[in-house]
UniProtKB/Swiss-Prot annotation:
This is Hemerythrin-like protein. It holds the Pfam family Hemerythrin. NCBIfam families: bact_hemeryth, hemeryth_dom, Hemerythrin. Gene3D superfamilies: Hemerythrin-like. It comes from the Eukaryota. Fe cation 2 binds at E60, H75, H79, H107, D112. PROSITE patterns: HEMERYTHRINS (PS00550). InterPro entries: Haemerythrin, Haemerythrin_Fe_BS, Hemerythrin, Hemerythrin-like, Hemerythrin-like_sf, Hemerythrin_metal-bd.
Amino acid sequence: MATTIPSPFNWDSSFCVGNNELNEQHKKLFALINALDANRSSASALKELLDFVVMHFKAEEDLFAKVNFSDSTSHKETHDKFVQDALGLKTVGDAEIQFIKQWLVNHIKGSDMKYKGVL
């Protein structure tokens, strides 16, 4: 089920996962997506977003390992699938921005909320 994309597209307390480091990283993801949306032809904006996504996913997965998070395998699979899809982007238009925004919102409010109170 798709979660509504906030407008304006900004992090708010409904995205709080209970871990300050991850909340800050999520805030930066919102900012990087907005930067890409504002400059869709910028290869550097797309690269910066993808590089940060990879770093963020690794940070989450490292925390999962530390606490032996029960959903870590499934969660990592969703990360890997998104990275694979995102690395395949050649152009960034309305559909791609919508995909990225929807994925992030659904992922935080769905998968990431499963670790709230655990990490």
